[in-house]
Swiss-Prot record:
Belongs to the major facilitator superfamily. Phenyl propionate permease (PPP) (TC 2.A.1.27) family. It comes from Haemophilus influenzae (strain ATCC 51907 / DSM 11121 / KW20 / Rd). This is Probable 3-phenylpropionic acid transporter. Residues 1-4, 67-70, 120-130, 177-210, 260-269, 316-326, 379-388 are cytoplasmic. It is a multi-pass membrane protein. The keyword Cell membrane applies. SUPFAM superfamilies: MFS general substrate transporter. GO terms for molecular function: lactose binding; lactose:proton symporter activity.
């Protein structure tokens, strides 16, 4: 069966982000159901972020031609489903489970940058509307969190791996569809300049400060990603209610992205980063002390400020840089914010959480506050004016 590129990519994002919407909030709950403690969970999930970083870079580097992208997505999806199914067989052997989680994180993480590479290829090739396709991915994340989160509340946390296996199998099957227009290679005009290294990019003081600031802001979400579900269920909030809390946060993110250009086109990147950092400080400072469901529900709306505003700001910064730098700057952003730093902060959170869940989130607030000291003071949308 053949489908148009827009629908092929939309279905691919649907499968990937629906499974990710179950894995991110609920996999720690599955580990807890297998009798692993909070400190061990923090270590395992923190290590998984390192594997995600390494896997994303490794598998992406293997793609040499555009027509390899879809084949890679199919193989990575199949491997993800097989490894997830195998986790149920090794759940009670820590080291085998650790290896399985590392392998899963490596192969599954590559689906995100490779999928975005396919979107970029089709965007240049046929004018694909990436924004609309990516919104389907965000909506799929909500579907995974809310619908399948509710199912988890019914069947129990011990069956999370089987729900994930089913979703990843669906993701694998829809990858087998054939696009009507295959992705094709094109040689960029500035390809001869596209040899700048990561270290060379970070030698730019402005880029270094922006990347560190964004890494601190995004990294401060570490405890939220790993322990929010565990914490909320420990204070009497049901798994199905927890899924609603995750869902409303992502919904707020989608709404902000939809209106972001209208809201922020005249606001400098520096101000946006200050707004996001301040929101993180406030959100993490109080989240561990609120036990009322509806107050937490309202607090979750701040995800639009703590995550979406920061993401919008860094993407806008990257678009102002030379074309030959953009791909590697995206890699630095994802590697630092969603890999190395969040892995470190997750491991630290795992050591604090058994003693005090509230202080775990307060520590995240302190991390976000540190961003204030590195955010460039005057960095607007299109031109670097001044930094101190």
């Amino acid at each position: 069966m053949q489908v148009r590129p827009f629908y092929w990519l939309a279905l691919s994002f649907l499968g990937y982000y629906c499974a990710y919407g179950v894995f991110l909030p609920f996999f720690p709950a599955w580990l807890k159901s297998q009798q692993y403690g909070e400190e061990m969970i923090g270590l395992v999930i923190g290590s998984a972020y390192i594997f995600r970083f390494a896997g994303g870079l490794f598998f992406s580097s293997l793609i040499k031609k555009a027509n390899h992208i879809i084949i890679a997505l199919r193989l990575l999806a199949l491997a993800s489903a097989i490894i997830m199914a195998a986790m149920s067989l090794v759940a009670h052997n820590f080291w085998l489970l650790f290896i399985a989680i590392g392998l899963y994180a490596s192969v599954n993480s590559a689906g995100m940058p490779i999928g975005d590479s396919l979107a970029s290829t089709w965007q240049r090739q046929i004018g694909l509307d990436y924004g609309k396709v990516r919104l389907i991915g965000s909506a799929a994340f909500i579907l995974g969190v809310v619908v399948f989160g509710g199912m988890i509340g019914w069947v129990g946390e011990q069956n999370i791996v089987w729900i994930l296996t089913a979703l990843l199998s669906f993701y694998t099957i829809i990858q087998l569809l054939k696009p009507t227009i295959p992705p094709k290679d094109e040689i960029p005009e500035d390809s001869v300049q596209n040899d700048v290294g990561f270290i060379a990019l970070l030698k730019n003081p402005m880029t270094l400060r922006v990347m560190i600031a964004v890494g601190l802001i995004q990294g401060s979400h570490a405890a939220y990603y790993v322990y929010s579900t565990i914490y909320w269920t420990s204070i009497g909030i049901s798994v199905s209610q927890t899924s609603l809390l995750w869902g409303i946060g992502v919904l707020a993110e989608i709404v902000l992205f939809f209106f972001s250009r209208r809201l922020f086109q005249n606001i400098s990147i520096s101000v946006l980063l200050y707004i996001s950092a301040l929101a993180c400080v406030g959100r993490w400072a109080v989240i561990g002390y609120i036990e009322d469901f509806w107050l937490i529900f309202l607090l979750q709306l701040m995800h639009s400020l703590t995550y979406a505003v920061c993401h919008y700001a860094i993407v806008r910064y990257i678009t102002t840089q030379p074309q030959s730098h953009i791909a590697k700057l995206q890699g630095l952003y994802n590697g630092l914010s969603n890999g190395v730093l969040i892995a470190i902060f997750t491991a630290i959170a795992g050591m604090i959480y058994p003693t005090s869940p509230a202080m775990t989130f307060v520590f995240m607030s302190i991390i976000a506050a540190a961003a204030f000291f590195v955010i460039p003071r005057k960095l607007n949308a299109f031109l670097i004016v001044q930094h101190k």
